[in-house]
From Swiss-Prot:
Encoding gene per record: MT-CYB
Localisation: Mitochondrion inner membrane
Cysteines paired by S-S bonds: none
Protein name according to UniProt: Cytochrome b
Protein origin, superkingdom: Eukaryota
Organism: Dolichotis patagonum (Patagonian mara)
Keyword Transmembrane found: yes
Length: 379
């Protein structure tokens, strides 16, 4: 008799995706991040749902409703900090997942890679709108500054900003619609994840060697489910340590002050996971140029499949490309640091140099290094 997981029309889909899925036998811990991101997304949706039960999307009561959640709701403080720090954990895993994709040449799966970029934009939009909801000083002013960037769009910019605000400034209408979008987007993200999955399972997973692994596959369960559980335990240990010992470590103290449109914070900045893009935005003196650079800093990922000139897919046996990737990583850390600093000398200059280096490394140097490695292979 056929096993139910192989015959039942619904369970059969799950079986082919998570149990009997043929997986390369040599994939490392770097392939854990997909499952960890899925768990993180589930955690964010559940905690967010419980927070939404107590939160009020009104400029007068939003700040006090968050205080009420932390003080009066059973384990409200835990739910709130799990949600806030869960977002940070989500982005850490997301950046590692993208980094692994670049290192091992997973971007050659074009459909999977492009859906991944779309997912990144959706997650960034969700996180930005979530940051506005507590209605602290940084929430309100962050929303004002970032939405105001759209006014740089020729002809329709100002109208578009006022349309998003629902008035002539960030106010109750803005907060209400941001809450509506922040609530609905996390239910659209799993749909995009399913498409991401679908395209990945069309081609099969990549592996550290970058070679075709059709001749050497093993079932996903139990080998990689055990490995994923190990990754989950490490992730939960890190997240719970952050939540229970230093819940405000990654937050901004200004957000514990209720929003006041008459008092500007000394330094407006987004959450830490957007600082690299914010630094690129600030490094260009022109408003429209800054907005374009901000969008391109993420959209440049879509060019990776076209920029790949190497005869090898993975960077495992390409030491020069490895050095270049680690230089790019260091550059991103510098941009993140600069994004959190005030707009003054020498931070402006460092930010501009790091921004130029970011695009120059990806668009030009990586191609030259790949061609050089191809030459070396012929010797």
């Amino acid at each position: 008799m056929t096993h139910m997981r192989k015959s039942h029309p619904l369970i059969k889909i799950i079986n082919h995706s998570f149990i009997d899925l043929p997986t390369p036998s040599n994939i490392s811990a770097w392939w854990n991040f997909g499952s960890l991101l899925g768990i993180c997304l589930g955690l964010q949706i559940i905690t967010g749902l419980f927070l939404a039960m107590h939160y009020t999307a009104d400029t007068i009561t939003a700040f006090s409703s968050v205080t009420h959640i932390c003080r009066d709701v059973n384990y409200g403080w835990l739910i709130r900090y799990l949600h806030a720090n869960g977002a940070s954990m989500f982005f850490i895993l997301l950046y590692l997942h993208i980094g692994r994709g670049i290192y091992y040449g997973s971007y050659t799966f074009m459909e999977t890679w492009n859906i991944g970029i779309l997912l990144l934009f959706a997650v960034m939009a969700t996180a930005f709108m979530g940051y506005v909801l507590p209605w602290g000083q940084m929430s309100s002013w962050g929303a004002t500054v970032i939405t105001n960037l759209l006014s740089a769009i020729p002809y329709i910019g100002t109208t578009l900003v006022e349309w998003i605000w629902g008035g002539f400034s960030v106010d109750k209408a803005t907060l209400t619609r941001f809450f509506a979008f922040h609530f609905i987007l996390p239910f659209i993200i799993p749909a995009l994840v399913m498409i991401h999955f679908f395209f990945l399972h069309e081609t099969g997973s990549n592996n550290p060697s970058g070679l075709n692994s059709d001749s050497d596959k093993i079932p996903f369960h139990p080998y990689y489910t055990i490995k994923d559980i190990m990754g989950l335990l490490i992730m939960m240990l890190a997240l719970m340590s952050l939540v229970l010992f230093s819940p405000d470590l990654l937050g901004d103290p200004d957000n514990y002050t209720p929003a006041n449109p008459l008092n500007t914070p000394p330094h407006i900045k987004p959450e830490w996971y957007f600082l690299f893009a914010y630094a690129i935005l600030r490094s260009i003196p022109n408003k429209l140029g800054g907005v374009l650079a901000l969008v391109l800093s993420i959209l440049v990922l879509a060019l990776f499949p076209m920029l790949h000139l190497s005869k090898q897919r993975s960077m495992t046996f390409r030491p020069f490309s490895q050095c270049l990737l680690w230089m790019l990583t260091a550059n991103l850390f510098i941009l993140t640091w600069i994004g959190g600093q005030p707009v003054e000398y020498p931070y402006i200059t460092i930010g501009q140099l790091a921004s130029i280096n970011y695009f120059f490394t990806i668009l030009i140097v990586s191609r030259l290094v790949s061609l050089m490695e191809n030459k070396v292979l012929k010797w």
